[in-house]
Design a protein with these regions (language model features):
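Short, Lys/Arg-enriched N-terminal segments with co-localized hydrophobic residues
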Residues: 1-2, 7-23
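The feature marks proteins involved in alpha-glucan
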Residues: 23-54, 83-163, 168-184, 191
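Short proline/glycine-enriched turn/loop motifs at strand-loop junctions of beta-rich domains
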Residues: 58-64
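Beta-strand signatures of extracellular beta-sandwich domains
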Residues: 66-68
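Substrate-binding/active-site clefts of carbohydrate-active enzymes
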Residues: 125, 147-156, 165-322, 326-344
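Conserved alpha/beta catalytic core and glycan-binding cleft of carbohydrate-active enzymes
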Residues: 321-323, 335-480
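Hydrophobic alpha-helical segments, chiefly the membrane-spanning helices
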Residues: 485-486
């Protein structure tokens, strides 16, 4: 494996892989364990080859791993995977084919036997099922090369983002009901493309930001507790449907950003938690093992976890042609448990810098956005200049102060102008993006209109003033608006 070193970071050279394809010629376990592998999904997972499918999984402490699936009647007795001595198990199955479901039966170090979904699966069974699915990702042919080659980071151009949750932007048959069949609950990725693109263009948005699409078990969530970091949720269709959606967006001049939750993951038994009977992806049992949301915290100090997450971020940009990544809960990576009093998580910060540097230097003008509620400095400063390497940071302070201001009686606002002008005291410290996001309309917080002062009819004029103020804020041209706001 050829490695190019930039200060204390490393990026795998691009000629080491079959780019544009999905199968890796060779693989360096040393690079993987160092946390410098950027394309682990080209090695692990289920890969269709001539005559069958090659399966590989990382489970170093497992006593035995069996491959079970539709191709062997879910009986793994004669399908034990080979341990190659590096912590990797593999098995070639000549009769396996695309579309078949599978799992790994892991004989764990703690004595349990658990059927696990593939952490590197490219597709997943529609919930409530939890199996992985053999999928080919090279069938769809993108026609967006002109867009990809001309996109920029929009530092000096209009940047107006429309944030959506794919499952609730518009739902057929009035939405989710107990009588609905599982495959009738949502529109397909490609089905909704034309209508959504027309809406976005009509309202002069430049980008669509989609709440997390990584496979997740709970319909009622937005997808922030993921189980499949290389698997676009099957709720809205197959991988090719999502590719078609993004391709249509690009050919209509619309960029697409994905929300990426890399700090924590779902605790469900079929997923990555205690994968081989040890805390393989998460921190060992301690006060940092679980997040404030009840999920497992990724152990961002482990090289193999870093390789997993870097590869996931690269996967969405490489395979699906996303134009940017909005990284969730950065404060929980900067500080232990997101608590400034507990100190800085240096290993996690080093990982964030490494991931951002690699993404920025591999994918042409990809946009990296931090959802960060702290005052930690240099979030949007380049890595080579000592920063974290993000292009934009959500200005959550501006959002909170501005919404508080617009709740006030107009007569009383003269005593609270500090809520409007305070953000200018730190405005030039970072490259900020002004968010009016989903976080502000949930858990009884009310819509934007209902946050405004006045009787119901008066609230709409206040909301118009808010949006006008937002888009005219100093010279900044980066804004983010959510589907739920009005």
């Amino acid at each position: 494996c050829i490695v190019t070193t930039i200060r204390f970071f490393a990026i795998l050279s691009m000629d080491y892989y079959i780019l544009g394809g999905i199968i890796m010629l060779d693989f360096s376990s040393e690079v993987f364990y160092r946390g410098e592998c950027f394309y682990a999904y080209k090695y692990f997972g289920a890969h269709i080859t001539d005559g069958g499918v090659m399966f590989r999984v990382y489970a170093p402490a497992a006593r035995r791993v069996e491959l079970i699936g539709e191709f062997n009647g879910w009986n793994g007795e004669n399908s034990a995977m080979k341990n190659d001595g590096r912590g990797f198990y593999e098995l070639f199955v000549p009769n396996a084919c695309e579309g078949q479901m599978y799992k790994y039966r892991v004989y764990q170090a703690n004595g349990r036997i658990v059927d696990k979904a593939d952490p590197y699966a490219f597709a997943s069974e529609l919930r409530p099922g939890t199996a992985s699915i053999i999928a080919s990702l090279d069938k769809f042919k993108f026609t967006d090369s002109k867009w990809i080659n001309s996109r920029t980071k929009l530092y000096d151009e209009p940047f107006n983002i429309y944030e959506i949750h794919f499952g609730s932007w518009k739902m057929p048959n009035g939405g989710i009901t107990e009588e609905s069949k599982p495959d009738e609950l949502w529109y397909n990725y490609s089905e909704i493309a034309d209508e959504l693109i027309a809406y976005v263009k009509e309202h002069h948005f430049t980008h669509i930001e989609i709440l997390p699409l990584a496979e997740h078990p709970f319909d009622g969530s937005w997808g922030y507790q993921a189980a499949g970091y290389f698997s676009a949720t099957s709720r809205y269709g197959k991988p090719q449907d999502l590719m078609e959606f993004i391709n249509k967006c690009h050919n209509n001049g619309i960029g697409v950003i994905i929300d990426f939750a890399f700090v924590h993951f779902v605790r469900d038994d079929y997923a990555m938690g205690m994968f081989d009977g040890t805390p393989l992806y998460e921190y060992p049992p301690s006060d940092v093992n679980q997040s404030e949301w009840g999920s497992y915290n990724f152990n961002l100090s482990k090289g193999e976890v870093q390789s997993f997450l870097m590869s996931s971020a690269a996967f969405w940009l490489d395979i699906y042609h996303f134009d940017g990544i909005r990284m969730d809960a950065i404060s929980n990576a900067i500080y232990w448990m997101g608590n400034k009093d507990r100190g800085i998580n240096d290993r996690a910060l080093d990982f964030v810098r490494k991931m951002n540097w690699n993404l920025d230097n591999t994918f042409r003008n990809v946009i990296l956005i931090a959802e960060d509620s702290t005052d930690f400095p240099n979030v949007t400063r380049p890595v080579e200049k000592g920063g974290l390497g993000f292009d934009y940071k959500w200005d959550l302070g501006w959002m909170n102060d501005t919404l508080e201001y617009f709740k006030l009686d107009p007569f009383l606002r003269q005593y609270h102008h500090n809520k409007i002008n305070w953000s200018m005291a730190y405005f030039y410290n970072e490259r900020y993006l002004l968010p009016l996001s989903h976080d502000e309309v949930v858990h009884g917080k009310a819509t934007i209109v209902n946050k405004m002062w006045g009787l119901y009819g008066e609230k709409f004029s206040q909301a118009r003033s808010l949006y006008t103020y937002t888009v005219s804020y100093t010279h900044l041209r980066a804004h983010e608006t959510d589907q739920y706001l009005v």
